[in-house]
C-alpha cells in the first residue's frame, strides 16, 4: 500500500546524540478543503463523510500529498490521508524540528503551537508563534513558512491556525501534537492519521503501557462549516466565513470523535483493551464548548493536564472528566477487574455526557459515542457484539436513519414500535420494507471498503 506522502513530507536526518534515532526532523503540511462546492455540479468535493450521508464542509491540515486528492479518477471520495481531524504529529523531546506549512489553500493561514515549547522568533528573525499582526504575517495562498521548534518538555500539545481563529480552528485547522520523552533508539510514529490507536508507541510509552490511543473531540456548527458549499469564489467564501458568521450565535449540530460520528466511530475509534492492562489515552477537546467525557465500566486516572504531570498525591480517579476547550488530558486506563479501576470485560460505552453530544443533528444514537471494548466482545469485522447480532447495527449505517426516515427503535428489536405514522394494518409489509433497507445497509457495511469508494 502506498503512503500517498510526497517524497519530502517527512525527512528524518542525522543522529546528533548518537542514541540510535534521528534528531533532525522536517515535516511538511498542506491545507486542504473537504466537502467544498464543486464547480461541475451539486456534489461536494472531495467527499468526506463524518457519518452516513453527512458531509459538512471542513478545512484541514494534511501531510503533503502526491497524486490525486480523491481515491481514484472516477471517485469524488477523499483519499485516506486527507481527512478530519488534522493528523496527530509526534516528535521527540530535544529534536530539532522544522514544520513547513505549504499553503495550498485559497485563504491565508498559519500554525500556532499551543502549549509547545518554541521561540517567538527564529534565529533568522522570522515570526515563529503563528499569530498574525504580532508574530508574523500569515502564509498567503501559494506561499510557505518554516516553523522551528526544539521542545525541552514532553507532553500532549495542540496545533492550530491562528488566522481568524474563531472560524479557522472550528473549520478543522487543528490537531494534536505529542512530544515524546527522549529515549535511545526511539523512532516515533510521526503521523497518526485519523488519530485512534497508535500503531508504534514510543519507547517511553511502552515502559508503562500496553497500548496508546489518541482521542480528538470536536463539535460542528453547520451554519459555519457549510458556508464553503455555497461558493467557488474565494472572495465570497471569505466574506461568508469571516463576516457573515456570528460565533456568538453558535449552535452545534454534530459531534465527532477523531473526525467521525457514531456509528463510524465503531470502525475507527474504539479503545480496544485486554484485562489487566494499563493503557494510555490522550484526549484533546478541539471544540468551542466543554466536554464531559464519561467512561462506562471504568474509572481512569488523570496523569497529565496540558502536558504537565499531575503530582501523584493530586491525581484524580473518576468516570466523568470535564475538559475545557483546547485542553488536553492524559488518562491511565487500568483494566484490572477490582471494582474500582474496572468492572470486568464487556463492550462499555465511552461518550460525552452532554446529551446533545450523543446525537447527530438531534437524532440518536449518534454524535461522539464510542466504546472501551474488550477483545472478547468484538464481533465480525471488528465491530462490537450486540444483543441482536451485527444486523442490529445496520440501520445506523443508513443515511435514511439520520434523515429521520426510519423508525426510532428499528435497531433495537422494536421495528416501528410507537411510530405514530405506522399503519394499523399491513404491518408485515412495513416490517418487510424496513428489513430490506437494513439488509442493504448491512451489505454496504460489510462489503470491502475499496468497492464502496470506487464510484
Protein language model annotation of sequence segments:
Residues 205-301, 323, 329-333:
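Surface-exposed interaction/gating patches
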Residues 29, 99, 111, 161, ...:
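Divalent metal-coordination and catalytic microenvironments
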Residues 101-105, 283-287, 337-338:
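Asparagine-centered strand-capping/turn motif at beta-strand->loop junctions
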Residues 440-441:
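A cross-kingdom feature that marks long, compositionally biased intrinsically disordered regions
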Residues 287-289, 294-315, 349-356, 369-374:
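Active/binding-pocket-proximal capping segment
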Amino acid at each position: 500500500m502506498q503512503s500517498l506522502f510526497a517524497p519530502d513530507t517527512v525527512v528524518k536526518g542525522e543522529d546528533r546524540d548518537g542514541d540510535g534515532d534521528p534528531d533532525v526532523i522536517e515535516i511538511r503540511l498542506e491545507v486542504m478543503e473537504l466537502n467544498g462546492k464543486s464547480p461541475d455540479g451539486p456534489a461536494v468535493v472531495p467527499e468526506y463523510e463524518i457519518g452516513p450521508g453527512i458531509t459538512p464542509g471542513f478545512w484541514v491540515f494534511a501531510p503533503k500529498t502526491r497524486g490525486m486528492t480523491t481515491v481514484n479518477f472516477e471517485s469524488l471520495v477523499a483519499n485516506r490521508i486527507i481527512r478530519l481531524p488534522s493528523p496527530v504529529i509526534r516528535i521527540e523531546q530535544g529534536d530539532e524540528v522544522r514544520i513547513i506549512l505549504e499553503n495550498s489553500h485559497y485563504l491565508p493561514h498559519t500554525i500556532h503551537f499551543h502549549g509547545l515549547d518554541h521561540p517567538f522568533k527564529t534565529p533568522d528573525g522570522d515570526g515563529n508563534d503563528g499569530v498574525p499582526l504580532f508574530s508574523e504575517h500569515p502564509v498567503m495562498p501559494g506561499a510557505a513558512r518554516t516553523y522551528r521548534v526544539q521542545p525541552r518538555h514532553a507532553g500532549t500539545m495542540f496545533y492550530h491556525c491562528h488566522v481568524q481563529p474563531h472560524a479557522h480552528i472550528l473549520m478543522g485547522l487543528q490537531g494534536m501534537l505529542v512530544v515524546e520523552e527522549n529515549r535511545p533508539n526511539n523512532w516515533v510514529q510521526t503521523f497518526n492519521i485519523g488519530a485512534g490507536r497508535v500503531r508504534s508507541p514510543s519507547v517511553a510509552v511502552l515502559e508503562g503501557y500496553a497500548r496508546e490511543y489518541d482521542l480528538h473531540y470536536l463539535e460542528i456548527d453547520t451554519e459555519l462549516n457549510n458556508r464553503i458549499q455555497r461558493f467557488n469564489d474565494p472572495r465570497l467564501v471569505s466574506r461568508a466565513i469571516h463576516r457573515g458568521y456570528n460565533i456568538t450565535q453558535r449552535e452545534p449540530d454534530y459531534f465527532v470523535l477523531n473526525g467521525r460520528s457514531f456509528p463510524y466511530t465503531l470502525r475507527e475509534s474504539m479503545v480496544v483493551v485486554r484485562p489487566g492492562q494499563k493503557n494510555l489515552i490522550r484526549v484533546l477537546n478541539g471544540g468551542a464548548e466543554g466536554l464531559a467525557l464519561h467512561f462506562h465500566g471504568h474509572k481512569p486516572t488523570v496523569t497529565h493536564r496540558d502536558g504537565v504531570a499531575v503530582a501523584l498525591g493530586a491525581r484524580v480517579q473518576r468516570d466523568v472528566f470535564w475538559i475545557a476547550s483546547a485542553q488536553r488530558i492524559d488518562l491511565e486506563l487500568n483494566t484490572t477487574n477490582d471494582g474500582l479501576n474496572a468492572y470486568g470485560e464487556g463492550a462499555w460505552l465511552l461518550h460525552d455526557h452532554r446529551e446533545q453530544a450523543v446525537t447527530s443533528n438531534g437524532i440518536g444514537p449518534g454524535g461522539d459515542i464510542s466504546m472501551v471494548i474488550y477483545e472478547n466482545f468484538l464481533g465480525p469485522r471488528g465491530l462490537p457484539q450486540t444483543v441482536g447480532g451485527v444486523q442490529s447495527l445496520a440501520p445506523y449505517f443508513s443515511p435514511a436513519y439520520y434523515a429521520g426516515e426510519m423508525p426510532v427503535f428499528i435497531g433495537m428489536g422494536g421495528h416501528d414500535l410507537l411510530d405514530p405514522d405506522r399503519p394499523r394494518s399491513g404491518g408485515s409489509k412495513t416490517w418487510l420494507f424496513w428489513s430490506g433497507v437494513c439488509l442493504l445497509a448491512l451489505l454496504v457495511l460489510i462489503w470491502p471498503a475499496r468497492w464502496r469508494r470506487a464510484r
